[in-house]
Amino acid sequence: MKVFKYLVASLLMLAPTVSTHAEGWKNPTSFNGQSGSGMADPFVFKYRGTYYMYVTGDASRVYCWQSRDLVNWTGPVTCCSDPVAKFAYAPEVKYFNGKFYMVTSPAGNGHYILTSDSPTGPFVCATKNLGNSIDGNVLIDDDGKWYFYHAGSNGIMACPMSDPLTIGSEKNVVPAMGGQWTEGPEVFKRNDKYYMFYCGNHYLSRGYRTNIAVSKTGPMSGFMNQDEQNPILISTDGVDNLYGLGHGSVVVGPDLDTYFFCYHNLVSSGSGSYRQFCMDRIGWNGDKLMMYGPTTWRQDAPVVAENDYFDRTELGAQWVTTAGQWGIENRDYLAQTDATAQSYAVMKSSVASNFTAEYTVRLTGTGGSYGAVYAYSDSRNYSTAMINPSAQTIELARTTNGVTTLMGCYAINGVFDAKCWHSIRLEKRDTSLKVFVDNMLCGTVTDAAATSGYVGYATLGTTAQFGYIAHSPYVDGSALTATYLPVPSRLAASHAVDTDASFTEIPLSYGVAHALMLNAGNHATYNINARAKTVYNMGLRYRSSADAKVRVLVNNAVVIDEVTLPATKSVWNVLTLKDISLAGGHSVMRIEVIEGSIDLYEIDARTGSTITDVMTDNFDTTISKDWKHKQGTWTVEDGWLKSPSFGKILMGSTSALGMTDYVVECDMKFGSDVNAGILFRVTNPSMGGAGNDAQLGTDFLQGYFFGLTSSSVVLGKQNYNWKQLVSKNASFYSNKVYHVKVEVVGNTIKCYVDNMNKPLITYTDAQPFISGRVGLRTHSCVARFDNFVLTPLTGTTSGIKGVSLSSTPVSNAHCGIYTLSGQKVAQDMNNVETLPKGVYIVATKDGSRKIMK
């Protein structure tokens, strides 16, 4: 087992070398000059230190906004008014050798590629209609090869590109989501893995959502849907009216390290298509992508690395030059105009031993070499990453006490025009240094001598120009540990801001993730940013060989003390810590192990619930107002709730989303077909397609279902697809009443039919949904329901009056009275007044059930 110490403290000591903007951002965001469809399909990319954003265009133009920090944007400017680009769907831009290439599908009628000499245009059409449906996305791989991805009838398609204007034959690389329309691919590469965001099923549906797939084999094959995480971005419950999340782009933030996903949300459904801009952080637990969103409350602004844009006239005292002729030109870039010298310009800003740095370079002379300086102490001790334009290589060298040693020489793949602007990116962690040119990994060297120092630029026997330069003490995702992580969300345990634990590697199908090895006396501390002042539930995903005890502190106050985490026989399990009170905004949460030891993998932080009242509905005349989400046709007939075919209905408002442990039960009877049951721990329900199709949306939810068919009982998990957990043979018939009950406590589910003393199914889910609403679901059958009762298992009773008979008389003969947990407390009703306050089930001789309150 590979173990290494977590070194956060050293990074935090370096934090003053970067600056932040205090205002932050809050989703969704409005922009000046939004078009008729708002900020649909936002694409953001970075060029020479500036971010450029493009969205779906209107009838005559495509707009572009600009920012240096992803929060403060200027514009828009019209970047394209070419007649071919009317209603330009999802425009995306790539920079390559001095040209900007925009790919778009005007009105969804096939793709065109337009070109420009500037990211702000004007873009003009350079191709005929290239077809390939909609939502084109381009990846340039490390070997310089280009790939084109787009939506198709069978899912996401991939095509090789022989040049920036030519698209080859397509291949299906990701199947359609749920067999329905799938779109919006966004592919990027990190640490030799290919990550793809994609979305569906209909952009006008509130259930429009984002999935992720990962490939370790290549850009045209091997993409594996991450079912454990999908949908990775979804919101349909109505919290802050955020719906329809998808079609975004990935960009590295101004700290040079943190990834961000920029996407849109749907404001209106039906005929409307107005969308707004949203942005959330991506975290990395090893190779595992963690989506810290969606958020609707204020997030801290991205950290901005120490930088220089040379947008002035004088170089200034913050720079030191040696030899050559250095000066700022056009308030835009630094130029070195003496081709005879070996010269350097370094920025007097201390750089950490672990760092990320970005440079922008362009050759103006001939021959020689030019590039980046790092770890500069003085003129006799420094490291360089120099481009040799004649050989089309980048050479990494270390000079110590005046003696230069070549550490590595790597080819710059693909077509390379040195007279155009190019970027160099360095990532140094411990003694390992990665070098990228134009975001393509060229190679990795060992540079043990480079510890700290300055960054800058250098020329050798040539002239060159140099643009935006920046450096950050963060590398390989380390910046996120100091971030106030949003709650609710799923937190990686490894994203602790402070811990004295070690890491252990967790194998994934495509790489590795990390868990914390917490022994007695160890702790893990997290900066968290809570949506609101309320209670939260924390599902700890852990494993242990023996029982362990933990406590939880928030802002140094104990909120959970000495809770036992049962032994898991070293397999992963989840234990939910309930009702942790958090103030809205920033807090510090600390988990301490008191006894034993655990490996802590993730923390599923969800909004809790303060509901303790029993919720009931007898459907005497109408449907209770407690039912807040209805799909399909639901009516009350003769005191029964009826669904004629497909549908689902959920009890409780958004305040019920945090309910964890409870008993839910009801009576059921069927028409000619049998296929219906109880939903529980449900979140994010939606209907299918633009027309809110109840049949298509039958499985569009996250939660559990316990149901009856004519020949079985079945327990399943629905995560916008269906996964059967347990099925047992049993016979159920039309026009007979059955009493069905589910009891869910922690990650254990017990399911009953008629016999309330013996569950037909007992199941423990190692990775459960920890909270959610309850409801009913029917699938292609006429089903009726009565005497619906939801009882929170909180250890207290609230809002329950004294015992009384139901309004419908019930025969005293041959009946039994039961508690909701199935315990028989009386044979008949002669002594009903002596029963404690509560809710009871009366079983009559004809098999019907009535509720007593």
Protein language model annotation of sequence segments:
Residues 1-23:
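Bacterial Sec-dependent N-terminal signal peptides
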Residues 20-21, 301, 608-612, 796-812:
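Intrinsically disordered, low-complexity repeat and linker tracts
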Residues 286-537, 542, 546-577, 583-586, ...:
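Extracellular glycan-recognition regions
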Residues 595-599, 847:
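Short acidic/polar inter-strand loop motif in beta-rich domains
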